[in-house]
């Protein structure tokens, strides 16, 4: 059963299979073709990004939750190699902007997603420890550090939220009396997508996020058939439920809540629906700009694997 409200069976089948083909093609090209090595770290990071998109894409299609965890090993391999090679390519400022939760909203959310997936899927300890090495940022966030600490004893907990909008609501749910947690969790999930559409910042500093909304926020609003859309899943809520034992019954069936991640053997939490192929409400040009920022619809030249491209059709 398709879990996403958007996209029919043909859409999800096409793009799940296309991604699998591209993964193999990218691995083959990395082994055989030489290119500008300065692009290789970003290219490898985009490969890692492709794996976490595929995890969520398969969830959206309705695949068995047990099939999702197999993407962690190649994801970690690609990300680790990107970081290794990037040390000689990225400047200190670039390294900071790529990794700092407070500055990089995209990185914060992706780390939250991967932690949530890792907890829900109970990945092995060796993979978990590799993931934590890549995530870093220990002691930087009052919420995500606590979630990670549910499986990493002794982790330093931050004293502030890197991104109060929308994550203050989730922290309130975590801190609430148990009888209030479920309702507050639902409030977070119900406002999560809208509140990530944040106003632009007038100036930048070390404490100011580079972008006002996540790179994927408008995926599907334009050129839905192009394949960038992989779902809009609040994995952060699943992470908190797994870490703190919050009652998620009010969230089950919400179009943004991936509750089946916590119930791999069923029953399913998503209602049957008439899937749309999805016209959206994004302003003209905004979705295209977000896609360019993420690299997901930029084709990689067949003779240059080191270009910072991605895997989907133009």
Which residues fall in each region the model found?
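Eukaryote-skewed repeat-based solenoidal scaffolds used as protein-protein interaction platforms
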Residues: 2-220, 229
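Alpha-helical oligomerization segments
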Residues: 183-298
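N-terminal functional modules and adjacent low-complexity/disordered segments of proteins
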Residues: 139, 279, 292, 306-307
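Intrinsically disordered, low-complexity segments enriched in serine/proline and basic residues
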Residues: 294, 301-305, 309-311
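Short linear sequence motifs
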Residues: 16, 160, 237, 304-305
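Charged/polar positions within long, soluble alpha-helices
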Residues: 119, 242-245, 310
């Amino acid at each position: 059963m398709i879990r996403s409200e958007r996209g029919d069976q043909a859409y999800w089948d096409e793009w799940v299979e296309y991604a699998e083909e591209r993964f193999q093609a990218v691995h083959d090209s990395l082994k055989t073709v030489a290119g500008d090595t300065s692009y290789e770290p970003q290219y490898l990071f985009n490969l890692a990004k492709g794996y976490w998109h595929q995890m969520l894409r398969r969830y959206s299609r309705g695949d068995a939750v047990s099939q999702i965890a197999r993407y962690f090993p190649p994801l970690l391999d690609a990300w680790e190699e990107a970081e290794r090679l990037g040390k000689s390519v990225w400047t200190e400022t670039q390294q900071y902007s790529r990794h700092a939760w407070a500055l990089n909203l995209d990185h914060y959310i992706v780390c939250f997603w991967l932690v949530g997936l890792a907890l829900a899927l109970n990945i092995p300890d060796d993979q978990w420890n590799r993931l934590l090495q890549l995530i870093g940022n220990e002691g930087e966030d009052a919420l995500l550090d606590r979630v990670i600490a549910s499986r990493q004893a002794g982790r330093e907990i931050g004293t502030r939220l890197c991104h109060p909008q929308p994550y203050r609501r989730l922290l309130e749910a975590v801190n609430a009396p148990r009888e209030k947690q479920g309702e507050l969790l639902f409030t977070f999930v119900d406002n999560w997508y809208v509140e990530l559409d944040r106003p632009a910042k007038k100036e930048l500093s070390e404490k100011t996020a580079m972008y006002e909304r996540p790179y994927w926020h408008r995926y599907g609003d334009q050129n839905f058939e192009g394949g960038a859309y992989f779902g809009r899943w609040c994995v952060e809520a699943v992470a908190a439920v797994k870490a703190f034992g919050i009652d998620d019954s009010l969230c089950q069936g919400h179009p943004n809540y991936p509750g089946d991640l916590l119930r791999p053997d069923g029953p399913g939490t998503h209602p049957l629906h008439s899937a749309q192929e999805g016209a959206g409400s994004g302003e003209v040009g905004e979705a295209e700009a977000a896609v360019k920022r993420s690299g997901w619809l930029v084709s990689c030249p067949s003779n240059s694997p080191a270009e910072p491209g991605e895997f989907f059709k133009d």
